[in-house]
């Protein structure tokens, strides 16, 4: 069943990307236009003798209107080619300043184009005599902190067929790669990783370390649809002393809980790194502390299964995950409001009210939908129908109203499109599950 859903999602991805493409806007007399990336190949080179790293991105994209194509890279490119010609880029803010992005500094007609960008890789990387530690860990709480933090990428609405070609130049020891893609070893120091076409800039888990730097256990989990799903749980020997047996046991229990509630696990593998305080989710993978493991694996269904298309939809999965963490409690009344659904148009971050007020809002919806079995039947329906399909909040509302036969539009407008500063003080969010870690903290978990 999951295989059929995956193919259906892939067939729909191109049109879905176009329907969720952000609107163009003017900046300094130039029309910034968003593109649909169809494929991106990233050549990631780690030069261990020079202790430097770089990424060369080769991207095929399509624009539907003339203008200056948008992409993003936090790190300034050292070289950019657009349709084979050397160009520069412009770093610019959206009209109301909610986010920053890059433009190709060349007017382009609507249609297919190629974009080649080279950037140095400097974030979350550590060289030593043993090899290199490097990770592309992300956050939905900080601005420009998905894949664009490390290499050129698109906004989260876009599903892209991505490939990594990873080279360890001058490596004396074997490198281990933990990732949620398919790895092929081209030679002793070169690997090609292929990721599914439904992945977005928030989907990829990538972590490489010298062999022997981690403790790990590999095993398989039997899905209710008959698949044997490969799983690995691990932690760094230098930063964490935990129990692989306990980590495996808890991963297994949560896996079966989630399959019982929401159907077959949507992804082909599971990767769990026990590290940090709180956690972050990826498609079938997580970097998490032990206590947040259930929250993060839930996100393989909602966030990295049923996917938000923008920041204003990002609160939904966090509210649902937090509602699960709290035992799916039902409440009949709700005080206050929030602005979780109504931030500025180009917002990319998640409103942290999701962890508190959003959780309570889901409990309120569960009460309202009791005649239809509550909220969970709708959640399973969304996994069945919308897996790997980015959505806007408005689409989520429509799906809920259609499935249940109960209009919830007025409830969302009242409780998630408000001023954002009038919900109860004791519900002000402190997202311990996704606590913001500093770069130094994350560096410690490499």
For each predicted feature, which ranges?
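Extended, low-hydrophobicity, Ser/Thr/Pro/Gly-biased non-transmembrane segments
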Residues: 50, 58-62, 107, 116-211
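Post-HExxH zinc-binding segment in Zn-dependent metallohydrolases
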Residues: 152, 283-292, 312-348
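Zn2+-dependent metallopeptidase catalytic core
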Residues: 57, 69, 106, 155, ...
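A surface-exposed beta-strand-loop module
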Residues: 74-136, 190
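Amphipathic alpha-helical substructures
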Residues: 354, 359-434
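N-terminal, polar/Ser/Thr-rich
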Residues: 6, 12-53, 429-437
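Solvent-exposed beta-hairpin/edge-strand motifs
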Residues: 20-22, 66-88, 159-176
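Juxtacatalytic substrate-recognition/specificity segment
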Residues: 216-313
């Amino acid at each position: 069943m999951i295989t059929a859903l995956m193919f259906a999602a892939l067939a729909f991805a191109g049109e879905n990307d176009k329907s969720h493409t952000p609107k163009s806007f003017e900046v300094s007399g130039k029309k910034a236009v968003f593109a649909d990336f169809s494929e991106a190949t990233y050549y990631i080179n780690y030069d261990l003798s020079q202790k430097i790293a770089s990424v060369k991105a080769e991207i095929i994209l399509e624009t539907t209107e003339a203008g200056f194509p948008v992409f993003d890279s936090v790190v300034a490119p050292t070289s950019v080619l657009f349709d084979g010609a050397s160009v520069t880029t412009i770093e610019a803010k959206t009209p109301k300043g909610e986010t920053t992005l890059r433009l190709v500094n060349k007017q382009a007609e609507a249609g297919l184009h190629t974009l080649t960008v080279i950037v140095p890789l400097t974030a979350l990387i550590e060289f030593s005599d043993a090899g290199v530690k490097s990770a592309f860990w992300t956050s939905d709480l900080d601005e420009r902190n998905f894949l664009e933090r490390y290499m050129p990428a698109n906004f989260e609405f876009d599903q892209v067929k991505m490939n990594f070609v990873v080279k360890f130049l001058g490596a004396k020891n074997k490198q281990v790669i933990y990732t949620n893609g398919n790895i092929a070893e081209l030679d002793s120091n070169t690997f090609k990783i292929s990721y599914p076409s439904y992945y977005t800039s928030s989907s990829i888990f990538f972590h490489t370390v010298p062999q022997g730097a981690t403790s790990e256990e590999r095993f398989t989990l039997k899905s209710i649809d008959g698949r044997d799903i490969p799983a690995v749980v691990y932690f760094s020997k230098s930063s964490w002393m935990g129990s692989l047996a306990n980590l495996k046991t808890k991963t297994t229990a949560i896996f079966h809980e989630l399959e019982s509630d929401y159907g077959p696990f949507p992804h082909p593998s599971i990767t769990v790194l026990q590290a940090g305080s709180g956690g972050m989710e990826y498609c079938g993978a997580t970097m998490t502390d032990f206590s947040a493991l259930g929250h993060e694996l839930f996100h393989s269904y909602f966030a990295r299964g049923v996917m938000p298309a923008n920041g204003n939809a990002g609160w939904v999965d966090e509210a649902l995950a937090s509602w699960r963490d709290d035992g799916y409690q039902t409440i009949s009344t709700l005080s206050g409001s929030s602005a979780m659904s109504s931030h500025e148009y180009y917002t990319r971050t998640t409103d942290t009210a999701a962890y508190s007020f959003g959780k309570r809002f889901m409990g309120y919806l569960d009460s309202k939908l009791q005649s239809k079995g509550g909220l969970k039947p709708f959640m399973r329906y969304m996994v069945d129908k919308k897996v790997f399909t980015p959505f806007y909040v408005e689409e989520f509302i429509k799906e809920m109203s259609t499935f249940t036969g109960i209009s919830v539009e007025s409830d969302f407008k009242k409780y998630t499109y408000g001023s954002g500063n009038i919900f109860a003080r004791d519900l002000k969010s402190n997202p311990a599950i996704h606590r913001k870690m500093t770069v130094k903290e994350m560096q410690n978990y490499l």
